[in-house]
Swiss-Prot record:
Reactions listed under catalytic activity: cyanate + hydrogencarbonate + 3 H(+) = NH4(+) + 2 CO2
Known function: Catalyzes the reaction of cyanate with bicarbonate to produce ammonia and carbon dioxide.
Record gene name: CYN
Official protein name in the record: Cyanate hydratase
Location of the active site: 94, 97, 120
Entry annotated with the keyword Lyase: yes
HAMAP family on file: Cyanate_hydrat (MF_00535)
Signal peptide as annotated in the record: none
Entry superkingdom: Eukaryota
PANTHER family: CYANATE HYDRATASE
Lineage: Eukaryota, Viridiplantae, Streptophyta, Embryophyta, Tracheophyta
Keywords: Lyase
Length: 168
């Protein structure tokens, strides 16, 4: 929950979230100002993503409380993890439930539309948006936008480690 890496990481996340609170801006507002998705801003501030040097000035402009030392820490590769109890948090539990419930159907559609492969969670964008449903009630839209990665046929003549050994 606190960005992994123990007590030091938890303290950094608390300081980052305090800087966000001082800004009085939502993740979406910060994202708009910095040119990032709202989920990526949250990932950065929770130390689940690495801040890139070219993005730092825009993020600092949006969140003035980010100190030089916090920005430097945000530029270090994070320890991506989660607390095992997080799955019991109701919003996260329901997201997991939705993926489990719809996952097999989504996988089948990916296979129909793209072939045998997966959606990347590395070359990946995610956002959360609020829209009004046909009934006028608020609805949550979670968008997963990941690069398609086809599974490889494991041909021995394409396996570089084997080709290197044969030519040595």
């Amino acid at each position: 929950m606190e960005g992994g890496g123990g007590e030091r990481a938890a303290g950094v996340v608390r300081r980052l979230m305090a800087a966000k609170a001082e800004s009085r801006k939502s993740f979406s507002e910060i994202g708009e100002e910095a040119g990032l998705t709202n989920v990526y801003v949250a990932q950065l501030l929770r130390r689940q993503a690495q801040l890139k040097p070219e993005t730092a000035p825009a993020l600092r402009a949006a969140v003035p409380g980010l100190t030089d030392d916090l920005v430097a820490l945000m530029m270090e590769p994070p320890f991506r993890s989660y607390h095992p109890d997080i799955v019991h948090e109701p919003a996260i539990y329901r997201l997991n439930e939705a993926v489990m419930h719809f996952g097999e159907s989504i996988k089948e559609i990916i296979n129909e539309e793209f072939g045998d492969g997966i959606m990347s969670a590395i070359d990946f964008y995610c956002s959360v948006d609020k829209v009004q449903g046909a009934d006028g009630k608020d609805r949550v839209v979670v968008t997963f936008d990941g690069k398609y990665l086809p599974y490889s046929e494991q041909r021995s003549d394409h396996m570089m480690s084997r080709l290197t050994r044969k030519t040595s």
